[in-house]
């Protein structure tokens, strides 16, 4: 990913914006609801401060989690959040590189992270996620996607209370339909957008 994520200032600004995302909790709740009641291992890609993985593990008390991130400020936040949790393993990894060998998982989740990698890498990553999922596993990606038009994007910025000058320079937004098509082509089943608010969408696929 881009070097912005090495900056504590950039990471702090991102987390502050993320905390103010309208309806974010609705998307997170829908994501957690799509995870089977019994899961043993959950992989969180681009974990940030660990908010999503924390929600998942609270809802699925028998699960253990692996949190992947490469930003030093985010890794620091992860270590603070999960300092006393034996259920979480933290791994330093850049999503622009192939996933490390971490075994297989019953669920792979991500929240506002994959849109920071180039489009070609997005598809490669989706293929790698398919490979590490157990049969019956689910991939849930709460993601920032491209708007259908410049006008829709402007309205999204307005709803967020920001201007074009405030946009994250590391964003590499891709439309939702392309990503759903990729998931289907890779072999995921029941692929759909399970929740959406403007440019924020929950993309879900299952491995049968």
Map each language-model feature to its residues.
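Core SAM-dependent methyltransferase catalytic element
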Residues: 189-208
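A short glycine-rich, Lys/Arg-flanked "PGG" loop and its adjoining helix->strand segment in the class I
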Residues: 123-135
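Class I SAM-dependent methyltransferase SAM/SAH-binding core
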Residues: 43, 49-97
């Amino acid at each position: 990913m881009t070097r912005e994520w090495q900056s504590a200032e950039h990471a702090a600004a991102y987390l502050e914006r993320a905390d103010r995302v309208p309806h974010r909790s609705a998307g997170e709740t829908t994501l957690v609801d799509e995870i089977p009641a019994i899961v043993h291992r959950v992989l969180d890609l681009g974990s940030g401060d660990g908010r999503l993985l924390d929600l998942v593990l609270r809802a699925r008390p028998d699960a253990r989690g692996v949190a992947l991130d490469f930003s030093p400020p985010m890794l620091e936040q992860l270590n603070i959040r999960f300092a006393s949790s034996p259920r979480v393993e933290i791994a330093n990894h850049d999503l622009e590189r192939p996933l490390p060998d971490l075994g297989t998982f019953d669920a792979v989740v991500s929240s506002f992270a994959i849109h920071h990698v180039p489009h070609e890498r997005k598809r490669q990553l989706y293929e790698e996620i398919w490979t590490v999922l157990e049969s019956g596993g689910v991939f849930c990606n709460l993601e920032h996607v491209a708007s259908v038009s410049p006008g829709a994007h402007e309205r999204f910025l307005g709803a967020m209370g920001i201007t074009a000058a405030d946009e994250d320079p590391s964003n590499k937004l891709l439309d939702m339909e392309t990503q759903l098509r990729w998931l289907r082509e890779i072999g995921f089943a029941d692929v759909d957008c399970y929740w959406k608010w403007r440019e924020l969408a929950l993309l879900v696929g299952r491995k049968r």
